[in-house]
């Protein structure tokens, strides 16, 4: 039993004898076992709010205030304790032996009086009125006084105010104050609304490096590349006297090859500033070549921005299934950015195998096939159909094709009786195949690619018992072949692609990737893949090299996709193919997608 002590209000007992002011008086009984039960009472936030409210009333009436903050000549009576409790800036000022800790009036420079007024309102009430007129000054004030909650509220308010007319200015403000999230949101907003943003005054005030960052982005949201060119020219003409020398650097980020040919001739080549800028002529020449050669000529400027609806995709044509012996009819495209595979029209020659495939402009050419086929088909990427075109003069399989200067070359192969040194060239305008100078050495299953205006035939099998390490180079101007530096290894069923004036070779049941520089006639080892493969598909897409499928040491086909980035040397695995495949065609084209297109 517990006795509760209390105080009797009437100091006279019933007998008239006064008692002690504090007496023992049993009010009620409770078991001791309940003493561990505790009631933790809390009034919630209402208590702290009411205390702050009283302190704010004290501030308004200058009651108990012990410091005056002076800003731009305007005085704000405050309580040191309240300021110190809210701000580490003031806590350091008042709690250490600084001069301000002893002074009645403390002057603060570098901020606005109105911003200080709003700041103090927040300190004493937890509320602040943020507007478009005061947000910048209030942000700077809260940053100075290290009030992160108010600072973050200002940043959030700025994010909600983003508009094509102010997003660039807000991004510059965010960068200046290390607001990474806000800066990122501003940049994303500007990329998504670039055509509108480019019409406003802030765009004309961009620094060259800031403008280049936007122009270089694949995520720039436009319906056509002409919008980018026009934005650049407006920026240059806005301060033409001192911006003229920057024109070439800016145009390097404009994808001139993707402009409509009529627009390019009339508007770009017709511009007086460009006509008087010889340093830009190489960029114009690149665009003209692309208009003629299509995807044969690849550079960062030939890669479509995704918002146009077009993207570079890898198309895999046919091939053999896991254990061989069954030819696949599928034509499928792979988008490395999204990781998606999409089925296209099945190719008509799927009953054959070991045919050759290459990309011509934005279409796909398929020729030959086992046994001794001379048929040639063209896949029209716009119509998604296969069309018969002129047949080869000589049927073959285990040959290779590539495109050089707008024409298709079918090289070497096997006709069922002998290995071929025969080379044919196809002109799509006349729909005709003609023979050119034969190879120095007949080979089948070589690696073939074009680079620096010449055709390279690398390795291959000169007979059924050996492999060649020779590199045969064809010059279309002289219609002649020369031998170049030999391949560092001798393996069958290798593959080659060219990128940035260099040739890359892989496959042949080796993990190695080799690079050949035609200008130096020199080979170098540049990397390793994850597994040994032969008869794999190789294609350049978005500035990287993709190795797809192939046959391993156990003879089984693979569905692996490996990406090699020559700029960094990094090799990664990406989305697997729909099925294992080898001896397949593999090319890169531009493909339109409604999901990506911005109307």
Swiss-Prot record:
Principal location: other
Subunit structure: Forms homodimers. Component of the BCR(KLHL24) E3 ubiquitin ligase complex.
Single Gene Ontology BP annotation: heart development
Organism from which the protein derives: Danio rerio
Domain of life: Eukaryota
Locations listed in the record: Perikaryon; Cell projection, Axon; Cytoplasm; Cell junction, Desmosome
Stated role: Necessary to maintain the balance between intermediate filament stability and degradation, a process that is essential for skin integrity. Reduces kainate receptor-mediated currents in brain neurons, most probably by modulating channel properties. It is required for proper heart development.
Name assigned to this protein: Kelch-like protein 24a
Gene Ontology CC: adherens junction; axon; Cul3-RING ubiquitin ligase complex; cytoplasm; desmosome; perikaryon
Matching Pfam families: BACK, BTB, Kelch_3, Kelch_KLHDC2_KLHL20_DRC7
Lineage: Eukaryota, Metazoa, Chordata, Craniata, Vertebrata
This protein's UniProt keywords: Cell junction, Cell projection, Cytoplasm, Kelch repeat, Repeat, Ubl conjugation pathway
Phenotypic consequence of gene deletion: Morpholino-injected embryos show heart function anomalies detectable after 48 hpf. Heart defects initially manifest as pericardial edema, changed heart rate and reduced blood circulation, and later result in ventricular failure and blood circulation block.
Domain (BTB) ranges: 65-132
Kelch repeats: 313-362, 364-406, 407-453, 455-501, 503-543, 545-591
GO MF annotations in UniProt: ubiquitin-like ligase-substrate adaptor activity
BACK domain: residues covered: 167-269
SUPFAM superfamilies listed in its UniProt record: Kelch motif, POZ domain
């Amino acid at each position: 039993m517990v006795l509760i002590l209390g105080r009797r209000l009437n100091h006279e007992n019933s007998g008239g004898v006064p008692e002690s002011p504090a007496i023992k008086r049993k009010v009620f009984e409770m078991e001791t076992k309940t003493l561990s039960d505790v009631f933790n009472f809390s009034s919630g936030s209402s208590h702290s709010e009411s205390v702050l409210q009283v302190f704010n009333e004290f501030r308004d009436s200058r009651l108990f205030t012990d410091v005056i903050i002076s800003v731009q000549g305007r005085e704000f009576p405050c309580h040191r304790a309240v300021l110190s409790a809210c701000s580490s800036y003031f806590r350091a000022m008042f709690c250490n032996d600084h001069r301000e800790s002893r002074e009645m009036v403390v002057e603060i420079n570098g901020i606005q009086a109105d911003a200080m007024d709003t700041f103090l309102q927040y300190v004493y009430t937890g509320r602040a009125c943020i507007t478009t007129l005061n947000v910048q000054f209030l942000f700077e004030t809260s940053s100075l006084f290290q009030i992160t909650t108010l600072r973050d509220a200002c940043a959030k308010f700025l994010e909600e105010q983003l508009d094509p007319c102010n997003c660039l200015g807000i991004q510059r403000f965010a960068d200046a104050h290390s607001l990474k999230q806000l800066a990122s949101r501003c940049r994303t907003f500007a990329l998504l609304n670039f055509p509108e943003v480019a019409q406003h005054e802030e765009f004309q005030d961009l620094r060259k490096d800031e403008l280049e960052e936007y122009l270089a982005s694949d995520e720039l949201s436009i319906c056509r590349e002409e919008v980018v060119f026009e934005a650049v020219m407006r920026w240059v003409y806005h301060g033409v006297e001192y911006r003229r020398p920057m024109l070439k650097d800016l145009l390097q980020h404009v994808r001139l090859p993707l402009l409509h040919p009529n627009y390019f001739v009339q508007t770009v080549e017709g511009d007086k500033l460009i006509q008087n800028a010889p340093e830009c002529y190489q960029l114009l020449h690149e665009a003209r070549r692309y208009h003629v050669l299509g995807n044969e000529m690849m550079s960062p400027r030939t890669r479509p921005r995704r918002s146009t609806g077009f993207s570079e995709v890898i198309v895999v044509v046919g091939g053999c299934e896991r254990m061989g012996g069954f030819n696949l009819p599928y034509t499928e495209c792979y988008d490395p950015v999204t990781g998606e595979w999409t089925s296209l029209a099945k190719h008509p020659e799927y009953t054959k195998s070991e045919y050759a495939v290459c990309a011509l402009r934005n279409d796909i050419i398929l020729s030959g096939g086992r046994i001794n086929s001379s048929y040639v088909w063209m896949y029209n990427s716009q119509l998604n159909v296969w069309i018969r075109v002129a047949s080869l003069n000589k049927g073959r399989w285990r040959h290779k094709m590539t495109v050089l200067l707008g024409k298709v070359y079918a090289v070497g192969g096997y006709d069922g009786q002998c290995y071929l040194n025969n080379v044919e060239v196809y002109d799509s305008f006349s729909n005709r195949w003609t023979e050119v100078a034969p190879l120095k050495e007949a080979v089948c299953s070589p690696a073939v690619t074009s680079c620096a205006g010449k055709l390279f035939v690398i390795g291959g099998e000169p007979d059924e018992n050996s492999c060649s390490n020779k590199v045969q180079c064809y010059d279309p101007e002289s219609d002649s072949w020369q031998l170049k530096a030999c391949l560092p290894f001798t393996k069958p069923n290798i593959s080659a692609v060219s990128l940035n004036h260099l040739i890359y070779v892989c496959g042949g049941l080796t993990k190695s990737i080799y690079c050949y520089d035609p200008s130096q006639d020199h080979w170098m080892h540049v990397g390793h893949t994850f597994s040994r493969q032969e008869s794999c598909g190789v294609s350049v897409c978005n500035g990287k090299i993709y190795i797809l499928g192939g046959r391993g040491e156990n003879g089984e086909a693979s569905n692996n996709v490996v990406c090699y980035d020559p700029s960094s040397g990094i090799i990664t695995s990406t989305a697997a193919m729909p099925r294992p495949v080898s001896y397949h065609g593999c090319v890169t084209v531009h493909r339109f997608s409604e999901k990506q297109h911005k109307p």
